[in-house]
Every structure is written in structure tokens, then in C-alpha cells.
Amino acid sequence: MLMNYSTLFKDNAKVAQVGIIGANGGFGYSFLAQVPRMQDSLSLRVICDLDMDVSRKLLESLKYDSSRFHPCRNQRDIEQALKTDDPIIILEDGTLLPFCKIDVLVEATGSPEVSSVMAQACLKQGIHVCMVSKEADCVSGPYLYNLAKQHNCVYAIAAGDQPANLIQLLSWVKMLGLEIIACGKSSEYDFVYDLETGVFEFQGQTAVLPDLADHWHLDGMQTLKQRSRILSDFPQFAVPDYCEMNVVSNATGLKPSCDRFHYPVCRVEELADIYIPVEDGGVLTKTGVVDVFNNLRRPDEASFAGGVFVIVRCHDEKVWSLLRAKGHVVSRNGKYACMYLPYHFMGVEAPLSVVNAFRLGLSTYDACTHQAIMLATAERDFKQGERMDLRGHHRLLDDVHVQLLSAQDAPVDAAPYYLIAGRTLTKDVRKGQTITIDMLDLDGSELERMYREGKNA
């Protein structure tokens, strides 16, 4: 998991010419802020977003040299820009990316169709792709992974987000020969509770909940039920969690623990007593699974929001007793332990994926196949002709419920959640129905073709 990067790259000092599309979001900003700090490894060649002026102002705010900026609207403009010294090409049209002589594309638009099409175009030209848009990856990732192999380049999910961090942690655990019982992540935002005042806080919302103090310490699974009940006015699941665990499942073969995840409200030190088999007092009816929890902490404790974890079986009583004495998270019965990374640093970490792809030909993945699918179920009656648009920062479909099923348990014709995005319904959908591919106008959808080919690969 940890390595000496100076040693790893000591015989390879090549500088990657990198492009980014979808640059004006949080991930894109953090990545662009990091690139100038890594001049021995990376050079920004292209920034692509919907508004050139916004992109230019973003680069200026990050102190990029404006003399390098070249707004380009066609291939001829790009050819002229490439004749200059160390240009930064500013695009609005992503179809021009393959002509910009980049080594690696960082794809961060968050648009499933656009992300997949842009990645495909670059991979076909031998350009490595680091995918930030998990909404695309969980649908087209297997296809793009295979396409990259065909063109002798790398397709990777970008470091700095939970899927890549968890995949990396899992690879470390597997290398150590430890048995994986469960793995997962914390949901995006912490549940913060002050035991002295009884004040609960979540995303700026507060409530006085004195009863929660009575269930602060874990006393069997009944404690989890009581916490969930007390916090019923606050959201205890999020669609992006399902998407991220879909990515992890496809990359590792680990299956969803259950259709809607357990989402316990719990503390990090409790994980090894919760994500264990039912017969040992936990929540799992099967092992080798992915899941999500809501992190409960005091105001004076560090955040775990967006952190990742793996539960392993303790293989030797003496070893794990020693580790428990050092403060590591070991279950009360001594049979299970939790290993975790309590962070994800977004674009600060993402350059490692770029450098690994360019210098070493390494991907986050060692496999990528359709192991799970996000099912979308109508929460109201929909009419033929309604358009299913994503909304908000978290890329949600209105009035649609999500589940994550293993591919073998899902209906054969089920439409992945993010394949539905931006599509028009071709027929009425009743409340409670699973949205299927034949209910969508997919005429001309490259994403649908990639999904189909990825399933059949």
C-alpha cells in the first residue's frame, strides 16, 4: 500500500503531458492546484470545460502563466498552439482532445455518456485515461478497461476518491494473504454528536437528541436499530455510495452485502464487531462483500467521512492480541480486525494515478468486469416521454430508488442507474417497477453499446 515512490520512479523521469476535462468541479480544481507542485512528473497540456473564459480564470487563480494559454476551437488552432513553447490548450469541445498530443486524460465531467465517449476516443489513440467520473465507470468501465488493453494503454479509476483508495487497500490486504470478510466506506458526511450537550449535527443541521447518548456504546445490533430510529429525520443513505461500491465490486469481484446496504450508524472502533457474520453477533449473512456505514463521532474526533475500511479474519490469536494492545481495531471476540484509511484527498492524490499510468503502465485495476448493477426503481408513476435528468452535486435521478445487486441476481434487462441519465422514457413506468432498457430511448447511445459489449466481453 505504501511504497518508496522515489525508488519506484528513479529510472524513469519522463514528464507526462496531461489533459483534464470537467475541470471546474472540486476534484478538477484540486487536481489543477496540485500539478504545478509536480513539475518533474506532470505538465498541464489541456483544460477542457464548457466555458473557455471560466477555465482561463480558474488557471489564473491558480497562478498558471497566462502566456501559455491558447484558446482553441478547431484542429488548426491546436496545431498552431502546439508549435509554441509549453502551451496550455483551452478547449470547450472535448472531441478535440485526441489531437492535443497528451499522454494522459483525467476525465472529471461526471456525465456518464460524455465521460465514456471522451475516454473511448482517447484510448483509441493510445492515450491513457484516469477516470474520476464514477457515474460513467460503473456502466462503461469494463468496456473501457478492455479497450485500453487492446490499444496498449491504461484505463484506471483515479486515486484520491474512495473506489481507488479501497481497491488499493484491498490489494494490499490480499497481498498479505489475509481473508477478507467485508469492506466498504463511510458515507460522505459524518454524524457528529456532543455527549455533554446532546446536540447532534449533520451538514449544518442540528438537533437536540439526548436519547442518543443512551446508545453511544455498542451493545449488540439492537444499538444500531436504536441509533437509526433516533436519527430517522436525517438521511442515512446516498446514491453516490452505491455507485462507488459498484465500481469496487466490478474491480474486485466482491459482491454487495445486501440490496440496500446495512448503513449502520456506528463508530470506527465498532466496525470489527458489526461487519462480521450474524452467528458472531454481526450483520452479515455472507462474507466477501462491500457495504457502507454512517460514521458517528464526537466533535473533538477526526473525521472518517469518505474513508475506507476492510474487515479481515484474525489468523493468529497472539498476533492480534498484540495488535489490539497497540490500539488497533479488533473485535471483542478476537476473531476479526479492521484495517482502514480515514481519508480521500481528491486531486491531491490523483496525480499518482497519472504518473503510474504514464511511467509504469500501471492501472488501479487488475480486472474490471460487470459484477454488480445499480438498479433504479420508480418511486412514483412516470409517463412516456418524461426525461430522466440528473440533478445536483451528487448526480441524482428524481423519484427513483436505488439498489445494488450482484449481476447474477439482477433482472437481465435492468437498466443501470446511470445509463438512464438524460434519457427519455419510451413507455409508462408504474410506481415500484424496475426501469429496464426497453423503457428508454437509447437511440445513438454509445454508453448503452459500451455497457452491452462490456457485459459480453
Predicted regions and their residues:
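C-terminal catalytic/substrate-binding lobe primarily of soluble NAD(P)-dependent oxidoreductases
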Residues: 2-10, 206-457
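Short, ordered loop/turn segments at secondary-structure junctions
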Residues: 50, 110, 134-137, 160-161, ...
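Short gly/pro/ser/thr-enriched loop/turn and capping motifs at secondary-structure boundaries
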Residues: 54, 136-145, 162-166, 187-191, ...
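Short acidic, glycine/serine/threonine-rich loops at helix termini
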Residues: 59-60, 141-144, 167-170, 191-197, ...
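Rossmann-fold NAD(P)-binding glycine/threonine-rich loop
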Residues: 114-121, 125, 134-153, 158
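Rossmann-like NAD(P)H-binding beta-loop-alpha module
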Residues: 148-149, 156-229
